[in-house]
Each structure stands twice: as C-alpha cells, then as structure tokens.
Design a protein with these regions (language model features):
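Conserved structural position within tetratricopeptide repeats
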Residues: 503, 563-564, 599-603, 646-650, ...
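Alpha-helical transmembrane segments of multi-pass inner-membrane proteins
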Residues: 1-8, 25-36, 57-67, 88-103, ...
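Interfacial juxtamembrane loops and adjacent helix segments
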Residues: 131, 136-148, 267-270, 278-279, ...
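Terminal, low-structured helical/coil segments at or just beyond the last alpha-helical repeat
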Residues: 668, 673-732
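Amphipathic alpha-helical repeat scaffolds of TPR domains
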Residues: 466-486, 503-543, 565-584, 605-629, ...
Length: 732
C-alpha cells in the first residue's frame, strides 16, 4: 500500500482518486487477513500497547459516525468523483494500515516500508518531471498531458515530492554508506526539481516549517557523543541541512524560475480561506457534533457560499474542498472529528518528542535518532500542509503511516530479553511501551473468546475485500460503456452495460444518473422512429407503447434511486428536474415533480440564478400566461414566476435569461416601458441576437413583445448550465 497507492491509477470515472481508493481499501483488508493468519499460525496473539492507538480508534469512530449521520451515507462512506481521500472507506483504510503496521511490523518490515515510501515519492516525482517536459511514458491520449501525474494536481504532487525532504536531510547526515548517500541525493534532487518547476508557495511554507521543526528537534535531543566537544560538533553538523531547507524554501518563495515553454500550469482553484472558515462556522452551527458528513463539502458550499460569487467566473461551481484539508475535515466531521484528529496529533507529538532519543535504542540506520527526527519532521511537513491546502490521497496515507512507522522504530529498536513464558499472558516492558501477549490453550474460554473475535475480524475483512472487488468490476464495465459512442445504434448496449455496473455496485449515484439520461435518449429514439413514418401511420404500435412505458418506468426509478443515494447533491436534483421535464408529455404529474426537484435544488443552492430561472420557467409554463389552448391563465402562478425571476436578478443583475422572461411577463402585464428598458439592456449585451432586436422593435412600435400573432407561449428552451448566462435562442 505504501509503495503502490501513490503510483497506481487506471482508466475510470475518476482516474486517480477512485483507483487509489479501490487499491488502498483492498490492500488494507488483505493486510488484516494476513495479520489474522499470522496470529493463528503463531499460536499466540501479541498486542503492542500505546496511547496513540486509542486516538486511532477514536478517528475510526469519527469516520463511521460522520458517514452514518450524513445526509447521504453512501457518498460519505464511498466518496464520489473528485472526493475520495477523506471518504469513510478511505479513512478506515488509513487507520487499518496504521494498526496492522504498528502491531505486526518487525525490523525488516520497517526497513522495507521506509525504502518503499521513499521510492514511491521518487518515482512519482520522476514521472511528473517527464510529463512536464513532454516525455510521455504512457502512449494513451488521456495521459498525454504535461500536467498529468500519478498523485493528483501538480500542486498535490509538489507537496508529496517535498514531504520526505526533512527525513532525507536528517538521514543523509547520519548514514555512512556512500551508496545510500548517492541514492538519497538523487531522490532529493529529482523531487526538488519538480517542486521548483511548479513553484507552489504552500509547498515552500511547509518545507520551511518542517525544517525549523527539525532544528528544534535536534536542539532538544542532541546526539549522544563521547565528550561535550564532540557532541557540540555533531550538533552543529546536524543543523546544516535543516537550515539549508529553511533558506532554500525562503529563497524560492520570493524567486520564481522562468516558465517552461508551452507549459501552462493552472492557478489553484478553490474557495478563499475566509470563505472556507465562514462555511465551516455555518455548517457547525447547524450540525455541530458530526458535521455535514465526510466528502459533503460541495453541498454545504452550495448552501452557504456568498452571493458575490455570482459576479465571478466561479458562480456556478461548487468546490469539492475548502481552502485546506483541516477546514474541510472540521466542516464535514464536526466537533467529534476535530477532537479525534487533535487527540491523535497531540498524543503522537508528545510521544515522538519523548522517545526520539530513547537511551537504549539501536542507533543505526533507520533506527537511529537522526532518522527518527527526520521522520517526525516529514510528518510535521504533511501536518503543516493540511492547514493550507487540500491533501491528496497518497499524502494523507503518509500522514497516518509515518506515525505508525515511527512508533515501530521505537519498539523494534529495543533490546528485549528472551524469556521462557510459563504463563499465558505477559507484559513486556519496552522503552516505556508495553506488549501484551496471550498464548492459545485448548479448553480455555479466553482462547475461545479471542478466536471468536478473530473470526469476526476475518469475516469482515473478507466481505470488505469482496465488496471492493465488486466495485472494481462495476467501474471497469461502466468505463467501457462510457467509451462507446452514444448513438441510437449503440444505445441498448450502453444501457445493458450500465445496468451490469449497477448490479455489481448498486450504491453509486452517478451510475443511476447516467442511466436515466441514456434511457431518456432511448425513449427519444423510439419516438423518432415513429415520427419517420407517413403521417397517417404515426401512432405507436402496442409493442412500442409497451417499450415506452417500460423505459419511462426505468427512467423514473433511476432518477429516484440516484436521489436516494445522494439526496444533498444539488446536481442530482437538477438532473431529476430536467428528466421529469422531459417526461411531461408521457407521465401525468411530471411537471409537478420537475417543480418539486427545482425547488429542492433552489433550497440546496439558494444563490444560484440558473436554478431559480429554470424554476421560474416551469411556473410560467404552468401558468399558461401566454394563452395556449383554452385553459385560462393562472395569475397566481404567473406572479410566483415573476417573483422568482426578480430574485434571480437580485442574485445576479447580469443574468440574461432571468431578465428575458421577467421582461416578457412585464410586457404581458402592461408594463411596456419597463419591459422595453429590460430588452434594451439585453440588446446592449447581445447585439447580434435577432430575437431581442425584433422584440425591441415591436415594443417601440407599440405592439406586444412577441408580436401579432404572439409566438408560441412556451418560453424558448433554456440553455444548459454551461451557457446559462446567454439569451435563449430564437424559436424556429
């Protein structure tokens, strides 16, 4: 897990996040199975005691409770596109790996894990460097981007690349073997090179903080020496590289290298720090104990974001994370999660500072005092970065693994006496820590109880592994379906593939959302075939009627299932509203369902003018204000539509769609001059729009906006979200 997770990715609906989560959860559960197997084969169970383990348990409970009490359990527990690093299953995987490593690693395991950690960071950085310079290693289009890497964003990789530098600096000074020094130097140069090219300010801040921390650690825990003079000299040497890291970070904070030709690095996108804190405060005000639920930050962002964003390029964007991982965690996990995380940080920090210079520790290699100081400083680097930037999944894994490895180095660095055990349980003193050991005995109720617990753990791990495998299969099927061109000829195959994905993993809302859209397109295919016939034969056959009925039922069921799995997602409600809108001619009451879903979406994102305008259009159509057919206009609904359009313009005075429909209502109400002023504003911003020009001419000539006879009462179809600021096209 330490080595493969940062490097692994696959073609999926989330190339990096989902693939890493699937691998991580599978490896974590396999490690549990291996640990149980080792315990049974050894004939005894040993449990290393440490207070930090209680905070790990507290963090696990926080992840479970925050997911359970979330508005959308499966989204919080499994994650969703772009949101996997802090999902319930990811958090439990980190904590399982922490526990298994802490409880079972010996000296060899620890040494291998340290080299795997360093190697994974080095390979990730090297791959990222090759990509930046256009040397694409993988011959596939999705990966032939200069900013693509195996970790996440270029900023996430920059943090990941620099995170081992404090350890490398400390270990480099203590190791004597020139070959190891050469390897460490190559790693450091490669990782620094990537960070320098990206020039991410937060990476330099974190490096400076960790460098200062390393200086402080060395000051508080000087290396033992034969004499005070030698100790002073060793202390001075130990400060050289940490201070170099600090100076290096400060220099590159102010100095940026010239950009590489053809390389465009996008600026970090996300809410400001102040906005993030404001959203956190409002969320905790309503959901203080467990927060909004893991990986639900975009939902509370949509609900609480400031109206001023409507004047920016991000007016329709709901970010997956706040300005920092720490704020996101507090927002989504609540006070319980904050207490759990702070307890872990505090207890491990105290333990680490107390045990760095354990007097009876083996002082060589990775078990040396400088190596432990470097591990702690690298962990502080990650901790510092969490307060300034969202943490990518591989870096979050390192945040939990490094403390486990640090504690293992204390346990394994002890020289313990070999003893013959005459009792079935024993406490071994180990540098202030303790190991509890129980030997299995036939006929013992204690042994029976432990075996029962082990079987429960084993069964849970096997079930979890099976579930992860099913999710992997579902995602592979779904990706293959998404790669097929969505034409009428391929529609049945796509529907069958997505249905197979759902059969394998029925807990992914996005599968149902896509399925409902494809089913609706299939309905249009059937209707299109009917329309191709001569006019006298344009009536659905019994088979076609049955097919349309079946597709309608499946579409509605898919919409409802998506909403049930992800009820707080404004995008799901908008999709549902649009789907019901398309079913108006086929399903009685579909128009009311569309209105209900847009009202729900408006409650979840109250400052979005697009949603309000869409809702206003539905009320306007239902009011029959423009007199289609024999039904009398409903003035109450028309007034409601008008109020909604006015509110949309309050939210964004430049929102053209809302102004267009409001002006039509004003014209219908006899407020011709006000309507003319609004249409002139639209013409000023859309001078090439023929419909607007004609309406202005009509009003100036004293005739209704839509002319004589009026154009069809149904308002022009609103554009998609991406084009929502434009004016509706002229009806044909």
């Amino acid at each position: 897990a330490i080595f493969l997770t940062p490097l692994f990715f696959m073609n999926s609906s989330d190339t990096l996040g989902l693939s890493k989560q699937l691998l991580l959860s599978t490896l974590a559960l396999i490690s549990v199975v291996g640990w149980v197997g080792n315990v049974i084969s050894a004939g005894n169970i040993s449990w290393r005691k440490n207070a930090v383990m209680w905070t790990v348990l507290l963090s696990a409970l926080s992840a479970v409770f925050s997911s359970f009490f979330s508005g959308g359990f499966w989204v919080s527990f499994l994650g969703d596109a772009g949101r996997f690093a802090f999902s319930g299953i990811s958090m439990l995987s980190y904590l399982i790996i922490f526990s298994v490593a802490f409880q079972s690693f010996n000296k060899k395991d620890f040494t291998v894990a340290m080299w795997l950690w360093l190697s994974s960071v080095f390979i990730s950085s090297l791959f990222g460097l090759a990509q930046i310079f256009g040397k694409f290693i993988l011959p596939f289009d999705p990966y032939n981007l200069r900013t693509f890497n195996t970790v996440g964003s270029v900023f996430g990789l920059s943090l990941f690349a620099l995170s081992p530098l404090p350890f490398i600096a400390a270990f480099f000074q203590s190791v004597k073997d020139w070959r190891i020094k050469s390897v460490l130097l190559i790693m450091a140069i490669t990782q620094i090179a990537y960070a320098v090219l990206i020039d991410f300010k937060i990476a330099w801040i974190s490096l400076a903080i960790s460098g200062l921390a390393l200086v402080l650690i060395n000051f508080k825990n000087p290396t033992e020496a034969s004499s005070p003079a030698v100790a002073h000299k060793e202390y001075q040497k130990s400060l050289v590289l940490p201070l170099f890291l600090v100076v290096f970070a400060i220099v590159f904070w102010f100095v940026a290298i010239p950009p590489i030709s053809g390389l465009e690095i996008p600026a970090p996108a996300g809410p400001t720090y102040g906005a993030s804190i404001d959203i956190m405060a409002k969320t905790l005000g309503s959901q203080p104990v467990f927060g909004s639920g893991l990986e639900t930050f975009p939902y509370v962002y949509a609900k609480f974001k400031d109206v001023s964003l409507n004047q920016s390029d991000y007016w329709g964007t709901n970010f997956n994370d706040s300005a920092s991982a720490a704020i996101t965690w507090a927002t989504t996990s609540g006070i319980f999660g904050v207490v759990a995380l702070l307890s872990f940080i505090a207890l491990f920090g105290i333990y680490a500072f107390k045990n760095i210079a354990a007097s009876n520790a083996v002082n060589t290699g990775f078990f040396s005092q400088p190596a432990r100081a470097g591990m702690l400083a690298s962990w502080i680097f990650i901790l510092a970065s969490k307060f300034f930037y969202p943490t990518p999944l591989p870096l979050e894994l390192a945040f939990w693994v490094l403390p486990a490895l640090f504690i293992v180095s204390i346990f394994q660095g002890q020289t313990l006496k070999t003893q013959e055990f005459s009792r079935s349980d024993l406490v071994e003193s180990s540098g202030g820590d303790a190991t509890w050991r129980y030997f299995f005995r036939s006929g013992s109720f204690g042994t029976l109880g432990i075996f029962f617990v082990l079987m429960i753990v084993l069964l849970g791990a096997l079930i979890g592994s099976y579930f992860s495998a099913k999710r992997f299969v579902a995602e592979r099927i779904f990706v293959k379906a998404a790669a097929v061109e969505n034409t009428a000829e391929n529609r049945d195959g796509i529907i069958n593939s997505i249905t197979s994905s759902i059969s394998s993993d029925p807990y992914e809302s996005r599968y149902f959302r896509i399925l409902s859209q494809v089913l609706f397109q299939k309905m249009n295919d059937v209707v299109a075939e009917i329309q191709k016939r001569p006019e006298a034969d344009r009536r659905a056959t019994p088979e076609e009627s049955a097919q349309l009925q079946n597709l309608t039922i499946r579409t509605i069921n898919s919409i409802r299932r998506a909403a049930a799995l992800d009820p707080k997602n404004v995008g799901v409600s908008v999709d549902a509203a649009e789907s019901y809108r398309g079913l108006v001619s086929l399903v009685q009451g579909a128009e009311d369902l569309a209105i209900q879903n847009y009202e729900r979406a408006s409650e979840m994102e109250p400052i979005n003018p697009f949603i309000k305008t869409q809702l206003g259009q539905l009320y306007l159509v239902k009011s029959n204000l423009f007199g289609v057919g024999t039904a009398a206009p409903d003035t109450e609904l028309a007034a409601k539509a008008r109020g909604i359009f006015e509110k949309a313009l309050e939210l964004n005075v430049n929102y053209a769609n809302a102004r267009y429909f409001l002006a039509l209502i004003q014209d219908k109400a006899g407020e011709r001059q006000t309507a003319l002023e609004n249409f002139k504003l639209l013409r000023a911003t859309n001078p090439k729009n023929e419909l607007i020009a004609q309406i202005v001419q009509n009003l100036e000539n004293g005739i209704p906006a839509l002319g004589y006879p009026p154009q069809p009462a149904t308002p022009p179809e609103s554009p998609s979200t991406g084009a929502a600021k434009g004016v509706p096209p002229s009806p044909k």
